[in-house]
Regions:
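A short glycine-rich, Lys/Arg-flanked "PGG" loop and its adjoining helix->strand segment in the class I
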Residues: 144-156
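Conserved beta-strand signature within the Rossmann-like core of class I S-adenosyl-L-methionine
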Residues: 158-164
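Conserved alpha-helix/loop element of class I SAM-dependent methyltransferases that forms part
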Residues: 39-59, 74
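Short, glycine-/aromatic-enriched active-site segment of Class I SAM-dependent methyltransferases
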Residues: 165-181
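A short SAM/SAH-binding and catalytic strip from SAM-dependent methyltransferases
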Residues: 130-141
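N-terminal, positively charged/glycine-rich alpha-helical extensions of SAM-dependent methyltransferases
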Residues: 1-31
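Class I SAM-dependent methyltransferase SAM/SAH-binding core
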Residues: 62, 68-120
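A short acidic, Gly/Pro-enriched loop at the edge of an enzyme's catalytic core
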Residues: 119-130
Length: 240
């Protein structure tokens, strides 16, 4: 069953358009230098996520919700794969990521940046070795559709690592989807959605304290995370 959008939003399409507009505005004002500084600052969150699927040599890796490349370029620094495909709905974010991919330290690697809907991936079935996604699932109105797409495109034995915030109290329907608030679910709900999509949780890492530290120190502009006392987890998923 698909997730129900919040009552204050008219439709999943409306949620997507508002979210896309918000991130296009945010990323168009962020240069490559700022994006690289953010990648360094968030390494305490990205590195544990990557460690769930390491090593990545000779793998086809997909980063869902690449944005400006905070996770993707950290992958290239730690364990370069055969091919890295970054997918996002934000043209502005992808523009920054494409620029960074041309830097001398990254241009030797094989990278594709694709603008697409994460609920309808432009990828062939059973073509991907590893899927990564960081702080993206909560932006999607239909999380089950996105998880089913992940299950469709991964090869047998593939690994999937997803991290995001999870609510610890009642649904926050009056809050913003764009800030990863209204779209948050509980860990239990996430587990059920994964099972419905043919995926199961093989491991997890609690990164709540790391995110709290980043937000408190002004390294991650996400005050709502603290205001709503959310958890942040990284999950390793495999196909059932």
């Amino acid at each position: 069953m698909a997730d129900k959008p919040c009552s204050s939003c008219s439709s999943p399409k409306s949620i997507k358009e508002k979210t896309k507009a918000k991130y296009n505005d945010q990323w168009k004002d962020q240069g490559e230098k700022a994006a690289m500084e953010r990648r360094k600052a968030l390494s305490m969150v990205t590195d544990p996520l990557i460690s769930l699927v390491h090593p990545l040599k000779d793998k086809v890796v997909v980063d869902l919700g690449i944005g400006t490349g905070c996770l993707a370029f950290r992958v290239l620094e730690l364990s370069p794969p055969k091919l890295l495909v970054g997918i996002d709905f934000s043209s502005a974010g992808l523009c920054v990521a494409r620029g960074i991919s041309k830097h001398s330290r990254f241009r030797e690697f094989s990278c594709d940046m694709v603008q697409a809907d994460l609920e309808r991936l432009p990828l062939a079935g059973k073509s991907v070795d590893v899927v990564l996604s960081q702080a993206t699932m909560n932006l999607l109105p239909d999380k089950c559709a996105a998880l089913r797409e992940i299950a469709r495109v991964v090869k047998p034995g593939a690994k999937i690592a997803i991290s995001d915030a999870f609510r610890t109290s009642n649904p926050m329907e009056d809050e913003s989807w764009e800030q990863c608030i209204a779209g948050t679910i509980t860990v239990g709900e996430f587990s059920q959605l994964c099972l419905s999509a043919g995926l199961f949780i093989a491991g997890q890492v609690d990164l709540t304290q790391q995110v709290r530290m980043l937000v408190s120190n002004g390294k991650w502009d996400w005050p709502e995370f603290l205001q709503h006392n959310m958890d942040y987890r990284a999950f390793l998923l495999v196909r059932s």
